[in-house]
Amino acid sequence: MACLTDLVNLNLSDTTEKIIAEYIWIGGSGMDLRSKARTLPGPVTDPSKLPKWNYDGSSTGQAPGEDSEVILYPQAIFKDPFRRGNNILVMCDCYTPAGEPIPTNKRYSAAKIFSSPEVAAEEPWYGIEQEYTLLQKDTNWPLGWPIGGFPGPQGPYYCGIGAEKSFGRDIVDAHYKACLYAGINISGINGEVMPGQWEFQVGPSVGISSGDQVWVARYILERITEIAGVVVTFDPKPIPGDWNGAGAHTNYSTESMRKEGGYEVIKAAIEKLKLRHKEHIAAYGEGNERRLTGRHETADINTFSWGVANRGASVAVGQTEQNGKGYFEDRRPASNMDPYVVTSMIAETTIVWKP
């Protein structure tokens, strides 16, 4: 007799050409991912060949009840690591029935920036270091922490191994492999400084695809933690006190920065970021003031700074200085930042904006 797991793992390709497409979108809070599935007559690899769909925006905080229809536009396709076969995950953005982007659709304006000739010519690359914290479902307390208590001080947990130092590795490894299967350019994972906190990296990715990949990687992580009965939080400072917060350091380069003499281009770009520090901070994630305190490997939120290999700076430059070209790392974005907003804003400030 078949058990539930057997049915969940049924291979549809043996009996039908039809596939399941899971449409994913961002809800009204700007961080809540939503999804629903539909049957399609056969495999699809081009998002422009996928049908648009709709949903009840009044149930996601994105439309009033008397005019609640929101339209999903498919934008990027990934292989589905949960259903496998020819089934797909579809990253969408959201529009009114008249075709106008709704206010929470940050992808639309990001895509306009990335498709502008000036930005496209520079082919901006991104590597995003997404930190997150795993919480016990019933207590909302970090995984591996004693209920109502605290583990030993930070030090042994970063990239640590062992049952007393590493909590949730099965979830992390499942997520790593699922992202690779899906076609996300996930480039690594590691345990973080605070116990129960982890990081995965996505990139290098070009332009708008960086945001698509980070959002779908987040979606896959939330689905895996759902299966595991664990809660994932992207809060930038989940535990107050002498514990590291969670960020989404954004590594960035342009064609000009990657060429000989690129270090001068990088320094000019950093100067532009300094001039627009307040605007960037306002767009870099909610609650970031709890994280950017000048302690725990962060810069103070009110002061812009940069340096070579300086983990306490707003922007860090590594081997780039010695090589004379390369990339830099914007360390200000919080773990709950919108990658569409952050990536496009960095490109706009450093390539398009004139002081």
From Swiss-Prot:
Q: Where is this region: Disordered?
A: 37-66
Record protein name field: Glutamine synthetase root isozyme 4
Q: What keywords sit in the KW lines?
A: ATP-binding, Cytoplasm, Ligase, Nucleotide-binding
PROSITE patterns cross-referenced by the UniProt entry: GLNA_1 (PS00180), GLNA_ATP (PS00181), GS_BETA_GRASP (PS51986), GS_CATALYTIC (PS51987)
Query: What family, per the record?
Result: Belongs to the glutamine synthetase family.
The chemistry this enzyme catalyses reads: L-glutamate + NH4(+) + ATP = L-glutamine + ADP + phosphate + H(+)
**Provenance organism:** Zea mays
Q: What does this protein do?
A: Plays a role in the flow of nitrogen into nitrogenous organic compounds.
Give the subcellular location: Cytoplasm
Tissue localization of expression is:
Found in all the tissues examined with higher expression found in tissues of the root, stem and seedling shoot.
